[in-house]
Amino acid sequence: MLDFLGTKQRTHTCGELRAAHAGETITIMGWVNRRRDHGNLIFLDLRDRYGITQVVLDKDLSAEAHAKAEQARPEYVICATGKVRARSQEAINPKMPTGEIEIAATELLILNDSKVPPFSPAEEAIANEEVRLKYRYLDLRRPEMQHNFEVRHKVALAVRQYLSGQGFFEVETPFMTRSTPEGARDYLVPSRVHPGEFYALPQSPQLFKQILMISGMDRYFQIARCFRDEDLRADRQPEFTQIDLEMTFPQQETIFGVVEGFLAAAFEAVGQQITVPFPRMTYDKAIELYGIDKPDLRLPPMTDVRSVFSDEELQSLKIEPGMPIVAIVIPNKSAMSNTQKKAFGKEVEEQVGAELAYLDVERLRTSPQFALLADRIDAAAAAHCKLERVEPDHRLVVISPRLGAAAVSRDTSWVYKRAGQLRLELGKRFAAEHKAFEKKGTAADYQFLWVTDFPFFEWDEQSHTWTFAHHPFTSPHQDDLIAGRLESDQAAVRALAYDVVLNGTELGSGSIRIHRQDVQQQIFRALGMSDDEAKERFGFFLEALQYGTPPHGGIALGLDRIVMILAGASSLREVIAFPKTAKAIDLMVDAPTPVSDAQLRELHIRPTKQ
């Protein structure tokens, strides 16, 4: 029979009692983590969010409490009252913060029982993630998950406190708004009052936060929930949380300083240090050095060693002249046998494809014709990577377009991008040897970077049209506007856009916004949008821009991703309380589900089966 709590009150948590509390009479409450029955003595490990405390039920001390303990099983909810006593020296458990004490219970209440759980929260590793998600309330009891949400709380609190101290107002923007697709599909909400019309859940608060700047709010932030109906990947969720902010009259550096400030505060809140200010790098330079717009600075940059080749050497090696020849350094790669070298070379060639040639520098060194060339490549790569020389235990991979390759008609960025993919693949492949990704407990574990000056437009190969690289409310560079490049040279237009990157992961993206209606309409036209279409989709915003809109800009960073990195979690699902699967299903509540015909009729909807 279950007991009532009555007037009992918890005096301490299961994680706070220490040897200094010995002799005190206390009451703790929690879940039975483990139970060990030794006849007249029963040991219950009682668990709550704060830790675990051992409770001893001695039949000689209280037969009634001992009898209750005989009924208790894992995950029963228990209230235990008794005296704190120091454990004997041999019974101390150094692995537990409460390991020096135990509770000699004189009273035990069973407040609730439990079915046999499909897994125990005491288990350190649970292989089946679907079972964890179905029984999320059990999964969240696990210490690892409790830790993740402690980190999340501390990060969000630190961000709020920092931004509030910098004069930002936290303002909530609507969940139910109009559909203005920003690249992904909207989640739509049918209106009962307006048949055939729909609200949309926000993909971001983008236009509302810009309107807040038009409203004179000056500095806004929000821990914002966002929704995107897109194809899911391991690092995506249909609903997610971002740290969203906007400012009036900023320069890019103003925004950078604010972001660096709240990130430093957030990392410090969980005991981590970072180095500010973050380095800056243009998009073009990032592509040239790393082959990607979100570089991982923990690995050495790539080097274009084209200048060390003579025309005769290029011809002999059948390399396309005038194109990059990219050297990739893999640090601390141990020596390979001839068989391993052959297999390695084959693997590299498979990864880079038929258009690119792989040059084995060690093989060049053994050739009388190319031995000096190998030394020149080494010297160029070492200088660029700020090494005295390319050490013997470093592996140098050099790739370049083959003579006559079909792709050479394209711009040179494709070579850097392909080399960048190879650099990351090799970096992961040999991580155990170069140890660049291992944490050392210093600020160097977190390699931040600002990437700036992105292209404004991207060419869409499917539609054969230019589309926006960030979003259509990003301001182009002033010089590009004045030069008329929006109409004459769209590939050359730069955006006042910036990303903040950490260890090769994009944490956030932002920009200086368009604050003039004429420029905004010009951008819409450049994207192939007619004035009528722009008015239909964004008329309310174009109207607002006519009422003294100040220059403004902002950024949004993924809170879930920041917490995932700080908690050392392997997936966003580990830091979101009730996440969806890769198929956008909530296994715990079994959503989405069909709804009744009556509900559909109220919404004037008739489903069609595909």
UniProtKB/Swiss-Prot annotation:
Enzyme Commission (EC) number: 6.1.1.23
Which catalysed reactions does the entry list for this protein? Answer: tRNA(Asx) + L-aspartate + ATP = L-aspartyl-tRNA(Asx) + AMP + diphosphate
Entry binding sites for ATP: R228, D229, E230, Q237, E506, G558, L559, D560, R561
Q: Which residues form a coiled coil?
A: none
**Listed GO biological process terms:** aspartyl-tRNA aminoacylation
Q: What is the top-level taxon of the source organism?
A: Bacteria
User: Which positions bind L-aspartate?
Assistant: E182, R228, H470, R513
Q: Name one GO molecular function term.
A: nucleic acid binding
The record's family statement is:
Belongs to the class-II aminoacyl-tRNA synthetase family. Type 1 subfamily.
Q: How does it assemble?
A: Homodimer.
**Official protein name in the record:** Aspartate--tRNA(Asp/Asn) ligase
Q: Which organism is it from?
A: Acidobacterium capsulatum (strain ATCC 51196 / DSM 11244 / BCRC 80197 / JCM 7670 / NBRC 15755 / NCIMB 13165 / 161)
Q: What is the lineage of its organism?
A: Bacteria, Pseudomonadati, Acidobacteriota, Terriglobia, Terriglobales
